[in-house]
Regions:
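C-terminal motif of bacterial Sec signal peptides marking the signal peptidase cleavage site
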Residues: 18-21
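Sequence contexts marking disulfide-bonded cysteines in secreted/extracellular proteins
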Residues: 23, 77-79, 110-112, 161-163, ...
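N-terminal "mature-domain start" segment
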Residues: 23-102
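Extracellular/mature segments of secreted proteins
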Residues: 84-89, 118-122, 170-171, 198-201
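Short, solvent-exposed recognition patches
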Residues: 88-151
Length: 209
């Protein structure tokens, strides 16, 4: 091959390599940007940040037993309540765990927390508020929590539990608190401090619910 032609080929190959390198660099940058955007969507794609740990995720909300006439439960206590709110309520965020979820003719999504003086179960359901009022008409009294309609329940069938039910658009959220051994030793009465716990956690439900 003529030396001049050889130099021309080498120069062309070098230029092509530079174009490929630039193209590859651009693709990598775009891929990284896309991955970053995907990560952001996973954090902000819902109406609010939620916990993503697999063991905390709720079950599917539809099955052959689900009654279509009831509204869908949006607030999931195990993935919506922040660690900061749990700590503010005097509970240990590290004890967060799913309780006994119910998805049938009605739905209740459940999360349990432990504390030094009290343990707490939070159940978010789509049973109508009116049904709840009727069920506990003889063992409850009305109250408000952060301006939200609520019910203080002292069920005679559960003497160790103090319940506060908070109305939502889907139905209500049931906060059920029980004293630990240390709480009983400290002289806590059945409902001592429970309203304060619920007051700290209620904002996590969200005004949209």
């Amino acid at each position: 091959m003529n030396p001049r032609n050889l130099l021309t080929v080498i120069a062309a190959v070098g230029a092509l390599g530079g174009l490929v390198a630039c193209s590859t660099s651009g693709d990598t940058s775009e891929t990284a940007s896309a991955a970053s955007a995907s990560s952001e969507v996973s954090q902000t794609g819902s109406t609010r940040p939620t916990l993503t740990e697999s063991r905390l995720q709720p079950p599917p909300l539809e099955n052959e037993y689900t009654t279509q006439g009831r509204p869908e439960v949006m607030f999931d206590p195990c993935t919506w309540i922040s660690d900061e709110a749990v700590s503010e309520a005097g509970l240990d965020p590290a004890t967060r765990r799913r309780g006994q979820d119910v998805v049938a003719e009605y739905t209740f999504l459940t999360c349990d927390f432990d504390g030094e003086l009290r343990d707490l179960s939070v159940e978010s359901g789509n049973v109508a508020w009116e049904e709840d009022l009727q069920r506990y008409s003889g063992s409850s009294e009305p109250l408000t929590v952060n301006g939200r309609e609520a019910l203080l329940v002292q069920d005679p069938e559960q003497p160790g539990v103090c319940g506060i039910h908070v109305r939502t658009k889907a139905g209500f959220v049931m906060f059920s608190a029980s004293r630990t051994f240390e709480g009983a030793e400290a002289g806590l009465q059945r409902c001592d401090g429970v309203l304060e716990i619920v007051t700290a956690l209620e904002p996590e439900i969200g005004t949209e619910n």
